[in-house]
Amino acid sequence: QVKAVRSYTLPWLRGAGPLTSGNNVEVQLRGEFSPVSINTVVRTILTPLAFLNIDAAVSLGTGWTAAGLNGLALNTMADPFEPIPLEGLVLGTSFGLTGQFDFGVLVPGDWTHVAVVYRAGLDYRLNTAAGEAVPWQWLADAGENFNGWTWNQTALLAYQTPALKLVDAFGVLLETNQNITQFHESPMNEGGWGSDFMEVFLGPIVVLKWGGSHSLNIQFQFATERDYTDESVGNEHFFYRRMDTANPTYWYFRRAAFSYTFVCSQ
């Protein structure tokens, strides 16, 4: 996937003290392109205090099918992963609150920059081609999306070191995602398919920077997954699967991710 971002930052309610001197409003315009989808995002980030961000975003996208991959599909029990190329729009909105702190503020120096970042957010997504409680697939994922709300969290513990020339920071990244709208539909403790399951993603991350305009994020990610019974794990549609209530989840290695960013000069 390729992303193009244009950002505009304006001063906002700035004060004379260290907590408010950098207050601003940032507006991001982002285009996202893949072989099976196109998506546009407008995001606004308010910084009312040095350690606090408030963000909101809206998005609009659609998808098609190419090389056996579905950008957009319905995932019904009667017809799993039915492609619906360009037949629907995926509309989204999100709200989040981020707290961040650098311990280098308390103990100034080149070796004391330990950063802690935590964000809690709510996301809403709507596939205009999907009915109520009908699961759908987006960007060739597992096809377990629903029209409605999800709750997500991100936590980062990172260290900035002056000892390594290319390494800007390294640390541990934790992310979670949980369905709210379908939470009680088929819960884990009742042996359902796990509508209340919280995805957890955890792994080390390294940020490389060079030349003033180039950066590369490297991440190795582990994740939790639902553990189904032996009798149901092979069923094609997840509605027909049943949780193993004795051992409902397990960890697995999910991916190695590389994200390159180039910042154009003004």
Predicted features by range, described:
Residues 1, 22-35, 39-42, 54-58, ...:
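Transmembrane beta-strand segments that form the barrel wall of outer-membrane beta-barrel proteins
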Residues 1-6, 23, 36-40, 50, ...:
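Residues that define the transmembrane beta-barrel architecture of outer-membrane proteins
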Residues 2-10, 42-48, 95-105, 120-122, ...:
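Residues on the lipid-exposed face of transmembrane beta-strands in outer-membrane beta-barrel proteins
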Residues 6-12, 31-35, 48, 58-64, ...:
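Transmembrane beta-strands of outer-membrane beta-barrel pores
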Residues 12-18, 50-54, 105-115, 162-171, ...:
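Repeated loop/turn-to-beta-strand initiation elements of outer-membrane beta-barrel proteins
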Residues 28-30, 80-86, 134-145, 182-194, ...:
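Extracellular loop and loop/strand-boundary signature of outer-membrane beta-barrel proteins
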Residues 39-42, 57, 66-73, 127-137, ...:
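Outer-membrane beta-barrel translocator domains and adjoining extracellular loop/strand segments
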Residues 95-96, 237-266:
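Outer-membrane beta-barrel "beta-signal"
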